[in-house]
């Protein structure tokens, strides 16, 4: 795989959360949620971040997307330093980066139909007409093996594997 470009390069990533105590909410320590994590993902490479519950997998992903700011370390996506981007530039960059959880039930709003869940990233990142959104939603749902009828269902009406396909569709639609 050495001939493939590095798409994501994470170097010495650390994410700490302050522990506050007392009446004045003074910081009395830190939870070390992510401690010195480094890895690279190359083009055409499949990557899975695995570990026991509470070990920092989700926090690592959210930190890479800068939904949580890193305490220290470096994050490069396609050669660009994500830590140097302002909020708007990072929001735009997130179109190219998505997290897909093993069972994404918690990340799918239970009050939204699959159609609405798939429209949401389109509304966030693009200015499309309703007809344009309908076309994109239909195309991506079929690409991940969901029928048009399933677009009107809610996340709890799907199996774990089907919910994962919905999450993958959300990641790909942007």
How does the language model describe each region?
Residues 1-174:
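ABC transporter nucleotide-binding domains
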């Amino acid at each position: 795989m050495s001939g493939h470009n590095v798409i994501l390069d994470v170097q010495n990533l650390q994410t700490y959360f302050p522990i506050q105590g007392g009446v004045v909410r003074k910081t009395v320590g830190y939870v070390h949620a992510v401690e010195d994590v480094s890895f690279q993902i190359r083009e055409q490479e499949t990557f899975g971040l695995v570990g026991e519950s509470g070990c920092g997998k989700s926090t690592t992903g959210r930190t890479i997307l800068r939904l949580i700011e890193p305490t220290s370390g470096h994050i490069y996506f396609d050669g660009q330093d994500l830590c140097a981007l302002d909020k708007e530039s990072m929001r735009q960059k997130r179109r190219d980066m998505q997290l897909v959880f093993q069972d994404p039930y918690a990340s799918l709003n239970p009050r939204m139909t699959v159609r609405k869940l798939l429209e949401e990233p389109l509304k966030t990142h693009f200015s499309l007409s309703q007809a344009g959104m309908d076309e994109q939603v239909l195309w991506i749902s079929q690409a991940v093996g969901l029928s048009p009828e399933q677009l009107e269902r809610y996340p709890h009406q799907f199996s774990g594997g089907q919910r994962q396909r919905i999450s993958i569709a959300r990641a790909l639609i942007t």
